[in-house]
């Protein structure tokens, strides 16, 4: 099944292949599979939410680069696709929560709603870390993200 991001990806690869130059030295660093898929999911959300043409071009450029890395390095399976959908859903929730927190900030409303939203950030980040860890475990990532916070 082809989704809108696969089609957009294929169309944009051709557009940006000739435009992708790096005026500064490229920084290449190993990252975990979970981190890569997390970043790609965030870029897909940005492509959907951010409408500025200039911003879209920058997001598309990064998206294409990271999708190429995914295509070259990650063997997809139904489980990985499911985990990608889950991490994207968590990141969409975080996007909405962060926007609502900013609205509270704008109104200087730091009451019950602000506290609930603030707590939702770390609950969602904990889910996100768990999904990334599962992706890393399944794919045998060399690098694994370690998180340790006080229990709640």
Each language-model region and where it sits:
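Extended, charge-rich alpha-helical interface modules
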Residues: 12, 16-152
């Amino acid at each position: 099944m082809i989704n809108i991001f696969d089609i957009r990806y294929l169309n944009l690869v051709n557009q940006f292949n000739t435009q992708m130059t790096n005026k500064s030295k490229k920084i290449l660093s190993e990252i975990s599979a979970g981190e890569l898929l997390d970043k790609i999911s965030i870029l897909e959300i940005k492509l959907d939410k951010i409408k500025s043409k200039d911003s879209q071009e920058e997001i598309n450029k990064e998206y294409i680069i990271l999708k190429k890395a995914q295509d070259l390095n990650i063997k997809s399976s139904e489980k990985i696709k499911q985990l990608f959908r889950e991490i994207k859903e968590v990141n969409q929730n975080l996007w909405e929560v962060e926007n609502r927190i900013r609205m509270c900030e704008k109104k200087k409303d730091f009451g019950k709603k602000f506290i609930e939203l603030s707590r939702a950030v770390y609950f969602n980040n904990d889910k996100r870390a768990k999904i990334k860890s599962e992706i890393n475990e399944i794919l045998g990532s060399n690098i694994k993200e370690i998180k340790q916070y006080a229990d709640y």
